[in-house]
């Protein structure tokens, strides 16, 4: 019975987002196909990265409500002050699960919905960060994200690098050298995200954009 309830909630959320988005369906399906191919082609699995710190600022909470029903891996920082300040979660998704497939579509719709001008102007931010293809376990990937987010700079100390934020990621990659990109995306097959123009961007583990 629990699975039926969850599926109904997912379908309801999916319908709500479809009604609320003003965009042609061809654009969505193109984005969906690109991210699906990149995120799942290696092993049929990926991780959805969510920034839960923005939940309190967002007017539509159906995605966070649904995510509470899913297994997740929290990104645990070694710096105590960051534990509650930067709540990041990884949600494992599989192409073999219809339920996961529905969440995958919902996450794309939600990411596009977050790009609406009125939402950005009101400071709601972007909670859907990326779809990550990797051979790492959830715990291993969470540890890697935690270590990469905190960078030590000589004479300055530790700084918070929000590289996982889709509004930051696309600006950061061009200014990093090859070694820095590879370190940041170590053990990542592809890092997929939707940029500020609503375009799906696929980045390989070497930090280079994947050609369409």
Residue ranges of each PLM-predicted region?
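Terminal low-complexity "docking" segments
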Residues: 1-162, 166-212
């Amino acid at each position: 019975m629990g699975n039926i309830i969850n599926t109904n909630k997912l379908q309801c959320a999916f319908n709500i987002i479809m009604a609320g988005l003003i965009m042609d369906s061809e654009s969505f399906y193109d984005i969906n196909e690109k991210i699906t191919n990149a995120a799942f082609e290696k092993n049929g699995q990926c991780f959805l990265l969510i920034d839960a710190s923005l939940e309190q600022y967002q007017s539509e909470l159906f995605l966070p409500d649904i995510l509470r029903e899913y297994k997740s891996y929290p990104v645990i920082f070694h710096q105590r002050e960051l534990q509650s300040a930067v709540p990041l979660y990884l949600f494992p998704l599989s192409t073999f699960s219809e339920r996961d497939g529905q969440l995958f579509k919902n996450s794309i719709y939600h990411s596009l919905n977050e790009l609406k001008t009125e939402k950005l102007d009101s400071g709601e931010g972007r909670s859907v960060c990326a779809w990550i293809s990797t051979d790492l376990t959830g715990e291993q990937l969470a540890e890697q994200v935690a270590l990469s987010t905190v960078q030590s700079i000589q004479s300055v100390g530790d700084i918070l690098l929000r590289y996982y934020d889709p509004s930051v990621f696309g600006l950061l990659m061009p200014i990093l050298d090859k070694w820095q990109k590879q370190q940041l995306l170590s053990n990542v097959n592809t890092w997929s995200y939707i940029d500020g123009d609503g375009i799906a961007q696929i980045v390989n583990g070497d930090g280079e954009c994947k050609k369409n």
